[in-house]
Amino acid sequence: HELNAKKLDFIVSLGDLGDGLDKNEIPAILEEYAESVHPVKYVVGNHDFVKNSEEELKRLFGLDDLFYTFKAGGIEFIVLNGLDVSRFAPPGSKRYAQYEEYKIEHPWRKLREWDGMLSAESRRWLRARLEQAQKENENVILISHVPLLNDDTNAYMWDRAEILDILDEYPNVKAFFAGHYHPGGLQQRKGVLHKTVKAICNCTEPTACICHVYEDRIELEGFGEESDSEMFYEWKPVRLSGRALPGSWIVCATGELVQADGGGNFSLEVAAPGTYALKAMLDGRADAFLPQVVAPAENLQFRQEPEPGRRVVHGFTDGYALLRITDDGTPVRAFDLNGTAFGSLVKPGFWYENSENFWSRGEYVFSARGKVEIQTEPYHKSLRAKNWFKGDFHAHIIHGENFYCGNVPLYAFAARAEHYDWLYCAEAHENTRVKSDPEKWTQLLSGPDFLLRLNREFPKNGNGHVGNIGLSELHAHVAYDWEAVTNYELTLRYIASAGAVAVPVHPHYGGDGMTGKEVFLWLLCNPEMCPCLDLFYFENNPNPLAFWYMLLNRGYRIGVTATSDAAFDVGRTPGSRRGATFVHVPALTEANIVEAVKNRRTAVTTGNGGMILLSIDGEYSGAVLAPSGRRTLKCETWYRPGKTVTTEIVRCGETLVSRELVSDAEGRAEFEMEIDENENCWYLALLRDPELPGHVQAAASPVYFRDASFRKPDVYEFPRPFPRELADMLRSLSVEELMDERLFDRLIAHLTPKL
């Protein structure tokens, strides 16, 4: 009745008009809808099928088919039956048989009995409708009971990967509205708004979404327990403007800054529509914050309270830079990243670690009261000149809980200031609790000198966590029973077969559910699927070098990677004295990074800005050379200017040479030596700080010598189905057992050699 007072083109009922307990439920609800002054469109839900057949539902809703289209406002609306192939399909029908077959063929998937999918015929129908709308230059909005994307990882159509692939071909698709998942959800993907409307039965008041469609955007007006939101079709820079005290410096959390004019007016440009944080600073005034500003925005106002003795410090850096700033010894943090200033959802102290990072795009401003000291963290431009590029494939903006309100532009800014060239984020939550649009952000924030991808760890379960490089997204990710399928099978299906590369992350970290249980299994059954290992995730890992040397001496080619597991909610940003992986590539492209990791052309820093490169006759890590006599070995290091470093050249697990070098004014040092190599073997290089005994600051992956006599490790068939007793054995192993060479023999007893 309240909606009758609003100007609407039509109303859509997204399904489940009743609980399915009584055949009279739907007719009773239809009597209520009959009082609407607006046309009502109907979508069938799983509860509607409980007491009614498809034919009965078509009659009740006045439909010729449960798939149909209609036009309004020049937009083509396509209504889908997301339960086309499901337990609700007509008994004895071809579609019901397909439902039973699909369950048998996917025993490891969590296929809920109240979800479903489209038949191949229905997907062809959908493609034809989209094709026709595109020819007629019409935008399209799709409607279904069962969603494609929402905040829950399991409440969606079983064939969502196939449907999303179809939608990707048609840029005129603008939105997908659904019900089914009672808590609701909102997500943007490739410029398509996916909105799951909350179920009225779970709300304390009448709830709906009113959708306003414009030429450049879609606005959702929340009604009841639904909230407002907005999605622009095309992303471009927008402005934040308003007033502060004259001469104030206005800084955005993403690094943009401007000084207010004599009248106090300011205006600055940010990357795209979204939610940002602003800070105003002026001599003699306390810092003033606007922590959750939705851009674009006008008429913003700061309340700047007096604070005698506070002063503004303004300066410049040589492009993007990471600074360590103290005020009488206390860190000056970028937006106080251990507290509420950027808009945390909880009080300081929960999860937080103090961050000491301050980032600059080339110009910086902060306020202080005491003695200020500014230190610029090392930046080794010569590494880029040698085509070694710094990156990470296991980082988070925040963890899934979203306790800390990070956003994608802030993360890209921090990564660039910490001199990352490429970055894969394992989580991509926006600071509005809406998952970010991965493709839109990566297109907007990537460039020739910085590659950003928003993805996820997958698989991630009690068998271990797997990072991946080369997949811009994992929309094909499906809910699965991790006790019924191995990470090996999931990685092979969704990552390796797609041409991407996977790396088990922190395989020897002892946290609950964090340990990689399958490393030996991967090496035995598919060693090329495990080209590198994340060995230096945590400095307290038990003896990673001995484990690495053991695998190399068995004949495996194992490169090294290191990751940051960076996340704002724990005060860690990518370079916060955490790990990073360098790759050697001819140019900074995603395809080149994938090939570098596959070919073990990697080196790592584990903190404090150190790096080391190893080359033999000009061939870097990953190279395979013939053991044919004399060669020139070169070791290059990067560390803090003036610092003494210890370099180790390791041959087949034994230290061949150890040298102390003094870093020059740019932090560089190097040496060369002659070697005479006539055997199958490997060399790698380590960098240590004499003041930090026992800690590896950097490592270069091996260079290998191999001739025709070299015998690769035996490869074994992966057992299908995977034996339950073998799965149980792996899951019960301790970190120490997972690093013990004897595990190879225990596994081989269950495997068959590959012919």
Give residue ranges: language-model regions:
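Long luminal/extracellular ectodomains of secretory-pathway precursor proteins
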Residues: 232-392, 397-417, 423-449, 453, ...
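N-terminal active-site segment of His-dependent metallophosphoesterases
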Residues: 1-28, 390-396
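C-terminal functional module detector
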Residues: 296-305, 309-314, 318-328, 335-383, ...
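Extended active-site neighborhood of metal-dependent phosphoesterases/phosphodiesterases
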Residues: 23-136, 162-172, 186-222, 438-455
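Binuclear metal-dependent phosphoesterase catalytic core
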Residues: 70, 184-239, 567-612, 616
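A short C-terminal boundary segment appended to hydrolase-like catalytic domains
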Residues: 212-249, 262-264, 604-606, 619-628, ...
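Active-site-proximal segments of metal-dependent phosphoesterases and phosphodiesterases across multiple
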Residues: 105-123, 133-178, 508-542
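Catalytic cores of extracellular degradative/oxidative enzymes
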Residues: 37, 41-46, 55-62, 72, ...
